[in-house]
Swiss-Prot record:
EC assignment: 3.6.1.-
Catalytic activity: GTP + H2O = GDP + phosphate + H(+)
Transit peptide stretch: 1-20
Domain TrmE-type G: 249-416
Entry's Gene Ontology cellular component terms: cytoplasm; mitochondrion
Native source organism of the sequence: Rattus norvegicus
Listed name of the protein: 5-taurinomethyluridine-[tRNA] synthase subunit GTPB3, mitochondrial
Length: 492
């Protein structure tokens, strides 16, 4: 990304400092800015609740509720009895922590009260804080927004914090933590330094091009640096979809002819009865979706109608939707009945779905299909699954669970390929906003390469650097910032 409170007259420690909206203290004039407070831990009954404040009146709030003459030692917990500032009524015994700015999460004076988590206790403490002059309830994400405004977090780190709060799988947690730790921000800063150096050299050549003291090959070095940066940006843009899948979930679609066991597999993978299982063909007639954690990766698992011709109008609409969903899938689990591979529906699925997908995976260098032969328990011990040549496949029995471990391992490999491994490699682009600004930077570098006018070349470099600045939060519009901070709860 391109404190203070005046002295207050305190009462003796034995008596609580009584400051509230209806107490005549004149303390409002001592508070230069707004101070916010909120419950930071989860709603509902719990063992411990954390209530925090941020702003110049945090010290006043601390003294008002605890009767302390001075704040306790910074970042050290002390046990105090909390009293209402107006009535002096005891509220709870609390651990009190004091974080003076700028060495705090928001960069402002902050206080945390760790109280018992009963709803009445939390409500009473929040009401007491609301009676202190200069304090108001925080808005959603306002603590984090203040941290951003004071340079404690870049915008990509803010997004990483939001993703960490909402992470539901191990892969999401790892990716969010890397982004919160600033890896994406640091990568962008490195690119920005390259552009700044290139821009300085171009402008130096414009100003001192005829000067003998200017080193030779300055523009040639700029050109090499910009081309190397273009390669790096292009590589990250190619991986952008992987990061978005990791954040939102990969689309895994189960498809196949009727009665192949698709619904049984969906129920097994999701570990809950998502789909109705019946021996009658055509039971599933619409797309059934469920979010699943598979091998630590977020997945949107879809059950689809059995693919066959000649069914009724309603089932044919389900087949049409199933084929449409196949086009949107990241990974397709193609299911066949291992005991009925010679049927017309199985042969049709192999010809119309499996064969094109196998050819496509060879062309793209990435496998998108896992072919599964279900009902392996119905095969005799010495009989092959089929006399016909099949693409690589896995034998599976949803009835006995045989082959599930091999399927989960294969899925883990495929998910790592389409989502990326959050533990290794460069940080991923997890949002469309990241992709937009990186593409804008790359477009500006393309204009730099095409122009022969040094002034236009310098302007192209400025535009490229500006796009990187927007990515990390520099010069961002209020509308975009509002959307990002709306993802946070009130106490964050």
């Amino acid at each position: 990304m391109w404190r203070g409170l005046s002295a207050l007259v305190t009462r003796p420690a034995s008596a609580p400092l009584r400051l509230c909206a209806r107490c005549s203290t004149g303390a409002e004039s001592l508070v230069p800015g707004s101070t916010i407070f909120a419950l930071s831990s989860g709603q509902g009954r719990c063992a411990i609740a954390v209530i925090r404040t941020s702003g110049p009146a945090s010290g006043l709030a601390l003294r008002s509720l605890t009767a302390l003459r001075e704040p306790p030692p910074a970042r050290s917990a002390c046990l105090r009895l909390l009293r209402h500032p107006c009535s002096g009524e005891p509220l709870d015994r609390s651990l009190v922590l004091w974080f003076p700015g700028p060495q705090s999460f928001t960069g402002e004076d902050c206080m945390e009260l760790h109280v018992h988590g009963g709803p009445a206790v939390v409500s009473g403490v929040l009401q007491a804080l609301g009676s202190v002059p200069g304090l108001r309830p925080a808005k959603a994400g306002e603590f984090t927004r203040r941290a951003f405004a004071h340079g404690k977090l870049s915008l990509t780190e803010v997004e990483g914090l939001a993703d960490l709060i909402h992470a539901e799988t191990e892969a999401q947690r790892r990716q969010a933590l890397r982004q919160l730790d600033g890896e994406l921000s640091q990568l962008c800063q490195g690119w920005a330094k390259t552009l700044t150096k290139a821009l300085a050299h171009v402008e130096a050549y414009i100003d001192f091009g005829e000067d003998d003291n200017l080193e030779e090959g300055v523009l040639e070095q700029v050109d090499r640096d910009v081309r190397a940066l273009e390669v790096a940006l292009s590589s990250h843009l190619r991986d952008a979809r992987r990061g978005q899948r990791l954040r939102s979930g990969a689309n895994v679609v189960v498809a196949g002819p009727p009665n192949a066991g698709k619904s049984s597999l969906v129920n097994l993978l999701s570990q809950k009865p998502v789909s109705i299982v019946s021996p009658e063909p055509g039971t599933t007639r619409d797309i059934l979706e469920t979010p699943v954690d598979l091998a630590g990766f977020p997945v949107l698992l879809s059950d689809t109608a059995g693919l066959r011709e000649g069914a009724g109008a309603v089932e044919q609409e389900g087949v049409r939707r199933a084929r449409q969903r196949l086009e949107q899938a990241d990974i397709i689990l193609g299911m066949l009945d291992a005991s009925d591979l010679a049927s017309s529906s199985s042969c049709s699925f192999l010809d119309t779905v499996v064969a094109p997908l196998v050819a496509q995976s060879h062309d793209s260098g990435r496998q998108r299909l896992l072919l599964l032969l279900n009902k392996s328990d119905l095969l005799s011990a010495n009989a092959p699954a089929s006399s016909t040549a099949l693409p690589p496949h896995l034998l599976l029995s949803c009835h006995t669970g045989a082959g599930m471990d091999a399927l989960l391992q294969a899925l883990k490999t495929e998910l790592a390929a389409v989502c990326g491994d959050p533990s290794t490699g460069p940080p991923l682009l997890t949002r469309a906003r990241h992709q937009y600004h990186l593409q804008g930077c790359l477009d500006a570098l393309g204009r730099f390469q095409l122009t022969t006018d040094l002034a236009l070349a310098a302007e192209a470099l400025r535009q490229a650097r500006r796009q990187l600045s927007h990515l990390t939060g520099g010069g961002g519009t209020e509308e975009i910032l509002d959307l990002i901070f709306q993802d946070f709860c009130v106490g964050k």
